[in-house]
């Protein structure tokens, strides 16, 4: 799962920088990875689908931006797993911490661990604050929500 989280985070990071997701997945996973590619693809598509909400969750739990955008995206991938998959929370957190060590400096591990564990402890409160904003709740731009 650690490698899957890391690959999904790198693919999502590439998309946020302007790449197409299929090309980003091919670059980070390859074409013939079988079930592993399917899992990474699910994580990447799901994270992008809920990016507005996941980003708002991260912003609600930390006062300043995470310096390394890859780590911020990795946290979003792990939050997606915690909220939208049936994977055990302890496994998601553990693997995200290991993936952070592979992606960035060792200090990133403690940041990822702290954010994810805080989310698990304060889930209801954090989600209530985030869902109060329709942009975060629906993961759509404010202008689009205003038109609806």
What are these language model-derived features?
Residues 1-148:
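Class I Rossmann-like S-adenosyl-L-methionine
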């Amino acid at each position: 799962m650690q490698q899957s989280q890391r690959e999904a985070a790198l693919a999502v990071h590439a998309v946020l920088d302007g790449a197409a997701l299929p090309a980003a997945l091919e670059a980070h996973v390859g074409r013939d990875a079988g079930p592993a590619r399917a899992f990474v693809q699910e994580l990447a598509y799901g994270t992008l689908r809920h990016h507005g909400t996941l980003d708002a969750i991260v912003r609600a739990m930390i006062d300043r931006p995470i310096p390394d955008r890859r780590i911020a995206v990795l946290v979003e991938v792990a939050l997606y797993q915690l909220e939208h998959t049936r994977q055990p929370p302890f496994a998601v957190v553990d693997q995200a911490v290991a993936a952070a060590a592979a992606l960035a400096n060792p200090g990133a591990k403690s940041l990822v661990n702290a954010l994810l564990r805080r989310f698990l402890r304060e889930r209801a409160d954090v989600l209530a604050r985030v869902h109060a904003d329709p942009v975060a709740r629906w993961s759509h731009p404010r202008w689009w929500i205003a038109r609806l």
